[in-house]
Amino acid sequence: MKYDFKNVERFCQDKWDFSVSKSSKQEKCYVLEMFPYPSGKIHMGHLRNYAIGDVIARYKRARGFEVLHPIGWDAFGLPAENAARDNNISPEIWTKENIDNMRAQLKSIGLSYNWNRELSTCEPNYYTHEQKFFLDFLKHGLAYRKESWVNWDPVDQTVLANEQVVDGKGWRSGAVVEKRKLSQWFLKITDFAEDLLKCLQSLKNWPEKVKTMQERWIGKSEGATIEFEVVGLNKKLKVFTTYPHTLFGASFCAVAAEHPIVQDLKNGSSVVIPVLDTGIQEIKSKRENDEKIGVYTGLNVKHPFLDKELPLYIANFVLMEYGEGAIFGCPAHDQRDFEFAQKYNLPIIPVISSAHLGVIPARDQNSYNGSQCQATQMTKEAYTGDGVMFNSEFLNGLMVSEAKEVIIKKLKEKGIGKKTTNYRLHDWGVSRQRYWGCPIPIIYCKDCGTVPVPEKDLPVILPADVEFTSGGNPLDKHPTWKFVDCPKCGKQAERETDTFDTFFESSWYFAAFCSEDKSIDKDACNRFMPVDYYIGGIEHAILHLLYSRFFCRALTKCGYFDIKEPFSTLITQGMVCHATYKDENGKWLFLAEAKELIARGTKVQVGKVEKMSKSKKNTVDPNFIIEKYGADTARLFVLSDTPPEKDMEWSDDGVEGCSRYVNKLWRMVMQLKPVNMHYDNKSVTGGLLEYRKKIHKLLHGLTDDLENCRLNCVVAKFREMTNLIAEIDVAAGKSLIDEGICILIRVIEPFMPHLAESLWQEIGGQPWPKADESLLVDDTVTIAVQINGKLRATIEVAINLPQEELKKIAIDSVSSKIDQNKVRTVYAVPNKIVNIVI
């Protein structure tokens, strides 16, 4: 007798229909996995991600919650546009075909989605709402346009947000990012920087690692803004610093290559222009973490307190995106400044005492240039610790913390500085020079300027008749779509041809799911949000999760709903990993290829276990596993051995083991039919009572595990329960077996829904089982019996047994090992231990 998983799964999937109502009086539970990009094919990471969410959703339904568990498609993006260029196919057609394929694959897994709420971000009925959001953001001062230096990806030919630049390269293309000055639309995420930072502490069910990553990205810094007078120019150079107390140790100032003062110099007639041009190109080619390099501008700035001038450099480690795009350099107490001073032979002036420098009060006694410092105690690094100030006039003798406050006060009194809070976070540039994205609803008129598209004219829909024969944005070259009458004056004007960053769509989709028509229904959003369980990869910790938190605040400000935080519990599932293989020439091999070579006696290099990836050929196709073993086996395996947040290693043997368990459970229930739903085992005694206690303890434990998303522990417990039930004698304990089976089938349902549904038809249904509390309390305890401090036996006795009785039972248990006449004394600790001294 074998379980026919194919017919069972097909039957269940055709029958299932999961709906949700905003008017239900039941407590809500919103479960959401990060929606996928429609690449056309699911991978094992998808399977694990969605299986985790489905277990939670099915469990919560069983506990009586009104569960919202939707699915959709993050459908805009560059891959569709590239596919259009490569295959001469419309991005829309390519995307919709992929969605159809992936929808069928997801349904084959048996996921309990509210399919009637399915959405796709490339549909006009979805992005019309975000165009309206943008217009409202404009009204509320949360969106603006300006010319600014942007990150330009030369391969994808589009702008990238700061968050999309990883180690100086484009997050998608891997190309070295360039700096360009373009007019861009921005969203004012900085308006919420402090709130985004503070509210991280309220996210009790988020991984600490994610909160730390966001905290560092927001990057709050307390310091001062200082104005330096530029010698020979009627200009002030503003510098933000978190170390204002080291100002007396300053030996240079430096600006970013994109700083306005650099452009002023290039527009002038200075003799240093040729040198500047060459130096700036070299600086731009070097990333922040590379060797510290710079070029002297030919300008100096006046020290705010001393009668001296500081040379002004352009340096690669100064970022326009941070602070004012300018620094003062104190090499003695900043490592980057120290390396720069060594390279360019600049003075190194300590102003904070330390153990390796000592306190030297006279300024000239401890001032070195970069080459001289090689022969001093300061040979390797700057001193960045605490200490007492010296070489600093009115700061001498003060501790660092006090010196900061004093110098900020002095700067303010002189009108050349103030206390400042700075954030690493910058406003989000949302303009992208791509076709396959949501059009930005703006019109440019020569007479009226920048004109928002009237709400009645939304959505602005992408034209279908575009050409992808050349690079760049096809919307720029469109002969008709680009041109439109101005809504104000009626004259011919031009549309904005940039589209929104695709993170715009994914920053609010969770709110769209709350209503069936994909609109933002305030009552529905307030009913279902925040998302109770949000499941996805930790790679989204900064980009998507931070933008989503911003969007909730922005939409709340605009009156759409009253939710500040989008996600209550965040589960960042680990990756699915597999061993890697190479041939003798170092070429990556699929597992099947490796096995074939090994069978022929050819040497194969077995590499380390790594995340499944197409490039390393260590992938396993979920469709193959589902076709061969069934969806329940695939689901069970990806949930079995590893906590959801940890990486899991793929194992063919593990899949086989899960398949055997599925078939074993099905056969066991079939052999024990009929199952009596009306069992009564409250009066069982002896061995049957012990079995019943164990079953209910497992039920209690796995329910607690489910509440805390310890899904691998749940699997271990219901497999143990299966073995317990199989041990019970049918003749003596059929009623207890019936009880065990009813409990077991109910608790496996979130993990193996098709199998559970099949068995349900045999035994009927029931709500989530509740453990009998009276069976969870032990009435006996195991006691260790020692002889002269060494363990010799264990005994099972009643809890709180009187000491004298406990001693007697303990002595009897080791009577064969001692001469009772030689017992000197017996120490007994109730419920714990007995020690017999002889």
Curated annotation (Swiss-Prot):
Any one cellular-component term (Gene Ontology): cytosol
PROSITE patterns documented for this protein: AA_TRNA_LIGASE_I (PS00178)
Motif 'HIGH' region: chain residues: 36-46
Keywords: Aminoacyl-tRNA synthetase, ATP-binding, Cytoplasm, Ligase, Nucleotide-binding, Protein biosynthesis
Compartment(s) where it occurs, according to its Swiss-Prot or TrEMBL record: Cytoplasm
Main localization (coarse): cytoplasm
Reaction equation(s) it catalyzes: tRNA(Leu) + L-leucine + ATP = L-leucyl-tRNA(Leu) + AMP + diphosphate
GO biological process: leucyl-tRNA aminoacylation
Record has Amino-acid biosynthesis as a keyword: no
Segment forming the signal sequence: none
Enzyme Commission (EC) number: 6.1.1.4
Protein name: Leucine--tRNA ligase
Originating organism: Wolbachia sp. subsp. Drosophila simulans (strain wRi)
Lineage: Bacteria, Pseudomonadati, Pseudomonadota, Alphaproteobacteria, Rickettsiales
Gene: leuS
